[in-house]
Amino acid sequence: MPVTKTEIFPYIFYRDVPAALEWLTRAFGFKEEMRTTPPDGGMHAEMSLGDQRIMMGQGSKRWGMISPRESATATMGVFVYLEDVDKHHARARAAGAEIVDAPRDESYGRTYTARDLDGHPWFFTTPPR
């Protein structure tokens, strides 16, 4: 499957958005693009990794959207294309990410799976050349 630019951005809910910003930068190499505090409180932020982007906010039981650490289950994961899965895996492991599946070769490329500080699953893949 060729890598193409997407205009769909996952919106991920965290218990502590500033902590998630720091952790995703350190462990997964994301870059903070913006953060804002809406009038009703909480925080909204956006991050990028290359030309891929994610959004995040404070979880809210009122909206029925909370982190996996609070709900004890994840209902979605984030799939990210990378240039070098093995290098990324080493960085994530060194930063304390929970590695679910070590790097391995699959029909769709080289891939590994990790969980972030709130338990969201992340699937990192380098497509076949």
Give the predicted meaning of each segment:
Residues 15-16:
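Conserved beta-strand-loop-alpha-helix junction that forms the acyl-donor binding cleft
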Residues 1-11, 21-117, 124-129:
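Vicinal oxygen chelate
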